[in-house]
Amino acid sequence: IRFVSSENKKPLLPLRDIVIFPSVVVPLFVGRKKSISALEEVMKTDKSIVLVTQKNSEVDDPQDKDIYSFGCLSKILQLLKLPDGTVKVLVEGLSRAKIKAVSHENKKYLSCDIEKIDSEKETEENKVYALSLIKKFEKLSSLNRKDSIDLVKTLKSLKDPGQIADNIASNLNISINDKQFLLELSNLTKRLEKVYEILEKEAS
């Protein structure tokens, strides 16, 4: 493990059975002491934290080898302490983040050194692709998902093709591994194509 530089150092929160995407708002229930400590720390500062998925959800105290090397730099929008000692947080994904090093210096929680993966500039071709994604998703939703009506409205209000792809990816009925693959797919055109391909399979 390399030395973690302080300017890129962020608290790290490993997640079980969920992948967080940029521009998506998700509620999380957190119970592990280290995770709660990390959340308490970020609430004192800029409320930004790196959310990363565990490779095996059954590991209770995940180490470097137990988490993926790609996560999502996120912002805590709301934190609520529940009577049973757990915490409910509302998080918003901000950007893809490559985890370059994990630090165990602080015994209370993990932190990491990240490289932010900026979203690509949109092209006319990608905009057209994103619109066809929305149409495909809307058609699929009308067949089997009552709760997707609000999501379709949200998708139609978005202008950025990357945000459209990520919002759909977050709601796809696919494995955690497949969602992680989409998170790591930083090339926007390839990501739009892959999400469309998955929707095609779901529709067939």
Task: Locate predicted features.
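N-terminal low-complexity, acidic/polar interaction/targeting segments
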Residues: 1-204
